């Protein structure tokens, strides 16, 4: 079922002229994230082998259609942080058909560096979601949500409108420019405490503030000598 659905997706994308499909991969080992009960040696490795066995045939179809798949690094998926992203890419032999959808909101509550991630995986950033999160760790809550609903003030973190959280957006946009990213930048809006018709336009305006034009010449070129 997975192969058939994703193969149809690749063909449909190609028919519409879409060159990048964003989505999730699933994971047969996410339930082992706590590593307890103790994980049998080789079980994690087998999970990445299972991922490759499922996805390489799918990516063959994507290759044939001239379409790329951008996996969103996200809890519950095969790649959910820095090192699991390395492992997922290695499992597929770093084939170009498989890249990443960068969504820094999922980095914030894990204390991952989104800017360093962009640099280290710069050849795999196929799409960017501008989505925001904010931590509220107070010694009584944690990172796993405590089975509390979105927007509950007792949570340790929550999604908020872009510009109201902990993502260093200026650094993100500067790094995107540094790595030569020229793909889509999409505002993905989620905030349990704000009306979307207010929040989404405001988020777009805030993010556009950081999308400034690059310089046409080095700022210190005038001091270089040689030209009058």
Predicted regions and their residues:
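Histidine-acidic metal/acid-base catalytic patches
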Residues: 19, 56-57, 64, 79-102, ...
């Amino acid at each position: 079922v997975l192969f058939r659905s994703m193969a149809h997706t690749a063909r449909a994308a190609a028919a519409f002229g879409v060159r990048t499909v964003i989505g999730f991969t699933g994971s047969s080992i996410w339930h082992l994230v706590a590593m307890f009960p103790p994980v049998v040696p080789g079980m994690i490795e087998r999970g990445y082998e299972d991922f490759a066995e499922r996805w390489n045939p799918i990516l063959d179809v994507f290759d044939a259609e001239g379409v790329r798949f951008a996996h969103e690094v996200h809890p519950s998926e095969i790649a959910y942080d820095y090192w699991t992203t390395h492992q997922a890419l290695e499992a597929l032999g770093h084939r170009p058909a498989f890249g990443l959808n960068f969504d820094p909101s999922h980095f914030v509550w894990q204390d991952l560096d989104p800017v360093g991630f962009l640099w280290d995986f710069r050849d795999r950033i196929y799409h960017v979601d501008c989505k925001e999160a904010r931590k509220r760790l107070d010694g009584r809550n944690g990172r796993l949500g405590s089975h509390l609903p979105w927007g509950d003030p007792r949570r340790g973190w929550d999604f908020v409108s872009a510009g109201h959280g902990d993502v260093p957006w200026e650094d993100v946009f500067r790094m995107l420019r540094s790595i030569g990213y020229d793909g889509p930048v999409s505002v993905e809006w989620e905030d349990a405490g704000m009306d979307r018709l207010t929040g989404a336009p405001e988020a777009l305006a805030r993010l556009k503030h950081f999308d400034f034009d690059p310089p046409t010449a080095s700022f210190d070129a005038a001091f270089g000598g040689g030209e009058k």
